[in-house]
Amino acid sequence: MALVTTTPTVNDEPLFAEVDMASYFTSTTVRATVVQASTIFYDTPATLDKAERLLVQAASYGAQIVVFPEAFIGGYPRGSNFGVSIGNRTAKGKEEFRKYHSAAIDVPGPEVDRLSAMAGKYKVYLVMGVIERDGYTLYCTVLFFDSQGRYLGKHRKVMPTALERIIWGFGDGSTIPVFQTPIGKIGAAICWENKMPLLRTAMYAKGVEIYCAPTADSRDLWQASTTHIALEGGCFVLSANQFCRRKDYPPPPEYVFSGTEEDLTPDSVVSAGGSVIISPSGAVLAGPNYEGEALISADLDLGEIARAKFDFDVVGHYSRSEVLSLIVKDHPTNPVTFTSTSTKIEDQTK
């Protein structure tokens, strides 16, 4: 698997393209690219510009689906504690949240329109990790776009991890979509919610074939998780993570890596990537890459799905629904329901 230096650069650093290419395409082959790159923190317009430059490169390699990391638009606030301790929130932490809230995007909104235009312009299915702003609550969200430039929908992370829970809301069962497309059924789960067996089972029941796993986890153990999901679900797993150095975040005292700042230099790696593409048989098709910002691509033979399902179909012939079953509450969970709205809905259904 060659690592090929490309002429263009991003942030004045060389961008690498790691590509595992079949010698020929078939009608059941899809070229997939996962993007391993850092957000331009607190600068959403510049991050969108960077996303477009990366899409140009991916499209030039023939990518049909491109997956970006968790929270690429809006940023993953690695190392920050937002001034929180039990029973106390600091003024500096509240200001940090204000800035983070300002960098998030509305869905729908102008940034979503721009992402739609990018997907259509470069003729790719686009899976983009964003921080979604819904009033004054933020969600870690994945947006889906088709190659015609249409916004398909979103998935909100159902379970933020650890301190993420103080800044992100919890998604509900209404945003666990799997989209039927000409290149396969596409869905996504974000970072550690991929460790939730029931969420994965819901995805499998919806028939996911191209399972996107944007993440912020660059540990070796993450590779075991992605391989297990591919084998369990009989699906391709496309996992994209950011590669970031300390200098990719604002300097102190504006932004502080709690507990580790004194040990970091501007070039210290704070997120090592590890983006990877796994086949339904558990084979590594491309990656993992821990070297720097990269476009990691592979050709997906969709026939591998049927060959894998012959052995193991977790919601089909290898299930025991009369013994073990799952109920998914897939309706929105709104904190307030106005009776006038409910009455109108009831009247319309009579």
From Swiss-Prot:
Gene name linked to the record: NIT4B
Name of the protein this chain belongs to: Bifunctional nitrilase/nitrile hydratase NIT4B
Transmembrane segments: none
Keywords from the UniProt entry: Hydrolase, Lyase
UniProt-listed InterPro entries: C-N_Hydrolase (IPR003010), C-N_Hydrolase_sf (IPR036526), Nitrilase/CN_hydratase_CS (IPR000132), Nitrilases_CHs (IPR044149)
The protein's Enzyme Commission number: 3.5.5.4, 4.2.1.65
Amino-acid biosynthesis recorded as keyword: no
Active-site residues (renumbered): E70 (proton acceptor), K157, C191 (nucleophile)
Function description: Involved in the cyanide detoxification pathway. Has nitrilase and nitrile-hydratase activity in the ratio 3.3:1, producing both asparagine and aspartic acid from beta-cyano-L-alanine (Ala(CN)). Can also use 3-phenylpropionitrile as substrate, but not indole-3-acetonitrile.
GO terms of molecular function: 3-cyanoalanine hydratase activity; cyanoalanine nitrilase activity; nitrile hydratase activity
GO terms (BP aspect): cyanide catabolic process; detoxification of nitrogen compound
Superkingdom field: Eukaryota
Family assignment from sequence similarity: Belongs to the carbon-nitrogen hydrolase superfamily. Nitrilase family.
Expressing tissues: Highly expressed in leaves and cotyledons, lower expression in stems and roots.
Domain CN hydrolase: 30-302
Alphabetized Gene3D superfamilies for the sequence: Carbon-nitrogen hydrolase (3.60.110.10)
PROSITE patterns from the UniProt entry: CN_HYDROLASE, NITRIL_CHT_1, NITRIL_CHT_2
Organism: Lupinus angustifolius
Reactions accelerated catalytically: L-asparagine = 3-cyano-L-alanine + H2O; 3-cyano-L-alanine + 2 H2O = L-aspartate + NH4(+)
